[in-house]
Amino acid sequence: MRKKELKLVVAFHTTADAMAMEKSCKEKGVPGRLIPVPRSISAGCGLAWCVELSERTQIQMLLNQAGIEAEALHECMV
């Protein structure tokens, strides 16, 4: 089991947005991975993007450029 660390977790309204995020990140070489939404977060769909906190600015720019709507950005232990 992985050691829990403080991460940036991007929650989405829809699964389609989560999948679009994964595709955009892979195309742009942005780190991160899809995870089940942590229990501490309530989100519209069951998937979230997990990435290091240091990537917040890059993630926000990618969301804007790709036209992906995030429900919220959270900092939580994952």
What residue ranges belong to the model's regions?
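A short acidic, helix-capping loop that chelates divalent metal ions and anchors anionic groups
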Residues: 41-45
